[in-house]
Amino acid sequence: MTQQIGVIGLAVMGKNLAWNIESRGYSVSVFNRSSEKTDLMVEESKGKNIHPTYSLEEFVNSLEKPRKILLMVQAGKATDATIDSLLPLLDDGDILIDGGNTNYQDTIRRNKALAQSAINFIGMGVSGGEIGALTGPSLMPGGQEEAYNKVADILDAIAAKAKDGASCVTYIGPNGAGHYVKMVHNGIEYADMQLIAESYAMMKELLGMSHEDIAQTFKDWNAGELESYLIEITGDIFMKLDENKEALVEKILDTAGQKGTGKWTSINALELGIPLTIITESVFARFISSIKEERVNASKELNGPKASFDGDKKDFLEKIRKALYMSKICSYAQGFAQMRKASEDNEWNLKLGDLAMIWREGCIIRAQFLQKIKDAYDNNPGLQNLLLDPYFKNIVTEYQDALRDVVATGVQNGVPTPGFSSSINYYDSYRAADLPANLIQAQRDYFGAHTYERKDKEGVFHTQWIEE
C-alpha cells in the first residue's frame, strides 16, 4: 500500500510536521539519513499511520504518484545533496517541497534546474517553530501554481487556523517567492523583538520597575492594540523564576543569537535600494550584543549620563507603549515596502494583504493589527506605504510625540534605543519633501564629476566648483 505523502528529515521540525500531517488523516512515509532517528520516530509513533523507510529507494517506492515529498533537511548543501540523490528515482510530475530555512535565491536556482527534469518544486516558508509545526504553522509556499494546487489540500489541513476559521496558508507566487516572504517575515520578527527589548530597557533602567511590574505591563498591553504572540510570551518570561526565586530573564547572558535570516533581509534591501532601517538596526543590535567582553571593558573606560527619571512614571509608561506601537507600524511599513519592490522586480504579483492574513496565527509575529494591514491593501491595492493608509496615518500622527519623547529621554539618560531612534528618523525622512541630499549630490559632482539634476530646469548638469 502506497502512502499519500513523504517527509525526509526527522529532526524536530520534520518529525512534528509528519505527525501534524498524519493527524489530519493522511498516511505518511518518513526517511532520515541516520536510521537511529527513523527508529526513534517508529517508537514515538505507535498507533499512527506513519510508515518508516530505510533507503531513498524504499521511500520513493512507498509513495503514491505523483509523489509528494516534503524536505525538512538542513538548508544549503544538505538540501542540494538530498535533491541530487532523489532525482534519479523520481518520475515526471513528482513534487518536491523544501520546507527548510532556505535562502530564496537557492530556491529560484533549484526551481529552474528541476523544471528541466520535469520535477515540480515548491519552496515553502514554515513559521511557528516546533510547536507550530505540530499544531499548525503559518505556511508560505511558492513555486509552480499547478504543483501547489496538487498539495493545497494537505497544506490547508495542517496550517494554523485563524479565529475566522481561515487557514494560514496561501499560494505566494512563482519560484522563490515563498522563501522570500518568509525571509522578510523573519526580518520583521527581528525588529519586533528589538523594539520590545528596548521597551523593557526603558522600564528597567529608567523607571526602575520590578520584573513583576514589567510582566503585568506586558500582560496589560497584550489586552489592547499591541496584542501579539511576542508581547504575550514576554509577559510570561518576566514571571519565570529561577531556582533562587529570582527573575530568570535577568540571569540570561545578554548576547543575542541569530541564524542569519535577518541579515539576508537587510542585504536584500540594500540590493533593492529600499530603506530597511529598523530591521537592519535590529540586526546590528544583535551584533553589538555579541561583543560582550568589549562592552564590559568599554563600560569601565567610557562615561555617559546615569539613568534617572523624576517625571510621572505612569504617563511615561504609556508613552513607551505608544512608541512601541508606532515603531512596530514603521517596521512593518518598511518590510511590506520591501516585498512590494521585490514583487515588482521579480514579477511575483505578491498579494500583500493576503500575506498579513496568513501571519495571523501559527507564526512568531502573529498579531491583532495584521487585520489592519489587510484592510489597508483591500482599500488601496496600490498603496505605496502603510504609513499612508488612513488608519495608520492617524495612529502615527497621534503617537509620534510619545515616540519623540521616549527617544529623547533615552538619549539624555544614556539608554540605547536604536530601534526606536531608527523608527522616528525613518518617519521624519519619509515625510520630508526636501532632504539634504542636494549637498551630497554637489559633493559627488565636486570630487567625482558624477553630475546632478536641478529642481528648476530639465537636464543633467556638471559644475566646475573651483576656478583653476
From Swiss-Prot:
Residues noted as binding substrate in the record, renumbered to the chain: 101, 127-129, 185-186, 190, 259, 286, 444, 450
SMART domains: 6PGD
UniProt cross-references to Pfam families, sorted A to Z: 6PGD, NAD_binding_2
Statement: the UniProt record of this protein carries the keyword NADP: yes
Top EC class for this record: oxidoreductase
Pathway(s) per entry: Carbohydrate degradation; pentose phosphate pathway; D-ribulose 5-phosphate from D-glucose 6-phosphate (oxidative stage): step 3/3
Binding site residues for NADP(+): 9-14, 32-34, 73-75, 101
EC number, UniProt record: 1.1.1.44
List of catalytic residues: 182 (proton acceptor), 189 (proton donor)
Reaction catalyzed: 6-phospho-D-gluconate + NADP(+) = D-ribulose 5-phosphate + CO2 + NADPH
GO BP terms, alphabetized: D-gluconate metabolic process; organic acid catabolic process; pentose-phosphate shunt
UniProt keyword annotations, A-Z: Gluconate utilization, NADP, Oxidoreductase, Pentose shunt
Domain of life: Bacteria
Coiled coil: none
Function: Catalyzes the oxidative decarboxylation of 6-phosphogluconate to ribulose 5-phosphate and CO(2), with concomitant reduction of NADP to NADPH.
UniProt record similarity statement: Belongs to the 6-phosphogluconate dehydrogenase family.
Subunit structure: Homodimer.
Entry-linked NCBIfam families: gnd, PRK09287.1
Protein name: 6-phosphogluconate dehydrogenase, decarboxylating
